[in-house]
Regions:
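Hydrophobic residues in beta-strands of the RecA-like P-loop NTPase core, especially within AAA+ ATPase
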Residues: 189, 414, 453-454
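Basic- and hydrophobic-enriched, low-structure N-terminal and domain-boundary segments
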Residues: 1-154, 162, 406-408, 424
Length: 559
């Protein structure tokens, strides 16, 4: 039971108050507990005054001090979280009267009230419990959580994939009425083929059924995909751009005035084979000099001279021809990519397919060749951002007084985000960085937000990572990553940040605009789980030798 500290029976008292710390002296620590639970670092205390206000603080550290008479007392330092006043919790502790009169461990009801009062039931979204007391659920404000960008960081084995799966599973299962599907739309970029098992009803896309229209690439993406961007060859650029515009205009069926306005970024079809044929022709171009041979075997024939680009486009032609003939790129350059419409592409990405309407779309990128990974992510991300932009424009045009810009908002989830948007200026990452940085800066206005998950946050583009307003920081062991995350989090977190190195699997520091106060939480287990379990090397190695079908591996490799 709680020990009531009175003037006659003073077991604990406040001896110092600082802006970010309260120092408490406890005479008998064994009596300073509640419900027979001993205090520990991370436990909560309540400090009362005569104004019916109760300061709630979390214990950060303690010391044992020996007195001259041989007895000992304990000095506890606690970080003030906020004040309970009239049964309601308020952030901040500067309204407490000095000196406080009463110190005791906080009750479970005190702790629950901190979190339960922070958000209404309609806006609450809960996926974790307090790590120090699993009976206390820790909700976040669902609107502030999802309409601001989110970051999940943690070393391998910290529970990052399970946390991501838990959040998405709970988001798509919440319903405000009696219907089958809620209105959530989540697109997961799955680079390691982990999440299909966690979302068995998802709209699943991999290289076997992924079709992206290459002709919808913008100018930067086209250059990165087809040109040797490091070579800085103006000839190949000019021929490439000119051939695309020429073929688009040739295939355009509209007015001549509209035809002349077609440019490299026009979202109109062009035939990549026609571009290749043009490049070959220019590379072999011979020009008539206007003279004829007067004698010999060529008598009467026109004299020809090599064109200005003769032989200068050989590398470009070979590169382009190699891509067109590369079967691994059929999802981008195959026959289907020439006939798929914009509507079909968008429907498949946001779960509106005729055969399977789904809240979650998983884009399995494990089979996408690394050299086109950035382009693939860039095109999909840009299309989804532009969907949000156009949808808002149409919605506001039809409803001038509408306050909700987008009533079908989407969440883009980037697993291992440092592989798409690294903190690097290399040209091979330029397209994906440009697309995702634009979403990070402007996406919220159009109902398109990000969830970035990474084990190496220090390698993510700082422009993108700094836009996140909600952080789920799990165990981080790399000092560089620890320092990077600490730099982005508020200084007022005190020792909570230092605990990142010792968090157990599934534990996380939850901080951001959506939660009433930074907290160490235990993330709920997802069900079903992603296939991210470690391979049991030692158990497998001890089993009997297994034969492998090398021919089957070769066939799949060469497919």
């Amino acid at each position: 039971m709680a020990v009531v500290t009175t003037a006659d029976n003073l077991n604990a008292q406040v001896v110092a108050v600082f802006p970010d710390k309260v120092r408490i002296v406890v005479d008998k620590l064994e009596d300073f507990k509640i419900a027979e639970e001993s205090l520990r670092v991370g436990s909560y205390v309540r400090i009362a005054d005569n104004e019916n206000a109760v300061l709630i603080a979390i214990i950060e550290n303690f010391q044992i001090v020996a007195r001259d008479d041989g007895t000992r007392h304990h000095i506890i330092e606690a970080f003030p979280l906020g004040v309970l006043r009239d049964g309601k919790f308020e952030r901040g502790g500067d309204s407490l009267a000095i000196p406080p009169k009463n110190v005791e461990p906080a009750t479970i009801d005190d702790i629950r009230r901190i979190y339960s009062d922070s958000v209404s039931e309609a806006q609450g979204f809960c996926f974790s419990s307090l790590a120090s007391n699993p009976e206390v659920r820790v909700p976040v404000n669902g609107n502030k959580f999802f309409n601001k960008h989110i970051a999940i960081v943690g070393s391998t084995g910290s529970g990052k994939s399970h946390t991501l799966a838990t959040i998405v599973q709970k988001a798509v299962s919440e319903k405000a009425g009696d219907f089958t599907l809620n209105n959530s739309h989540v697109i997961v970029f799955d680079i390691h083929s982990e999440y299909k098992s966690a979302f068995p009803n998802a709209n699943f896309i991999d290289v076997s059924n992924l079709t992206l229209p290459y002709w919808m690439l913008n100018s930067e993406e086209l250059e990165e995909f087809f040109l040797d961007t490091e070579a800085n060859d103006h000839n190949q650029r000019n021929v490439f751009k000119g051939a695309i515009i020429q073929d688009r205009r040739a295939k355009f069926q509209g007015d001549e005035s509209e035809r002349q306005r077609i440019h490299l970024d026009s979202p109109l079809f062009f035939d990549i084979q026609a571009v290749l044929d043009t490049a070959k022709s220019r590379n072999e171009d011979m020009i008539d000099t206007g003279e004829t041979y007067q004698s010999g075997a060529k008598k009467g024939q026109s004299k020809l001279t090599q064109g200005s680009l003769f032989g200068k486009l050989t590398n470009f032609v070979n590169r382009l021809e190699s891509k067109v003939n590369d079967r691994r790129l059929d999802f981008f350059l195959g026959e289907r990519s020439k006939t798929i419409t914009f509507e079909q592409t968008l429907e498949s990405l946001i779960g509106y397919t005729a055969t399977n309407k789904s809240n979650v779309t998983i884009i399995d990128l494990s089979g996408v060749p690394f050299e086109v990974l950035s382009i693939t992510v860039s095109l999909i991300s840009r299309l989804l951002f532009e969907y949000g932009y156009i949808y808002k424009r149409l919605r506001c045009a039809n409803n001038p007084n509408e306050k909700v810009n987008n009533d079908v908002p989407i969440l883009l989830v980037y697993e291992e985000a440092h592989k798409y948007v690294p903190n690097s200026e290399l040209s091979k990452y330029r397209s994906s960085k440009v697309s995702i940085e634009r979403i990070a800066k402007e996406g919220r206005k159009y109902g398109v937000t990000l969830l970035l998950a990474s084990q190496r946050p220090s390698e993510i583009s700082e422009t993108i990572f700094s836009q996140c307003s909600n952080f789920i920081a799990m165990r981080l062991t790399n000092p560089v990553d620890q320092g990077y995350v600490k730099k982005l989090l508020p200084d007022s977190l005190g020792t909570l940040i230092d605990k990142m190195t010792s968090l157990r699997q599934g534990e996380a520091l939850l901080v951001g605009e959506s939660i009433v106060l930074p907290s160490i939480v235990q993330i709920d287990r997802c069900n079903p789980a992603p296939s991210s379990n470690d391979i049991p090397y030692w158990e497998l190695w001890k089993e009997e030798w297994r034969d492998m079908d090398i021919e089957a591996i070769k066939a799949e490799w060469y497919r």
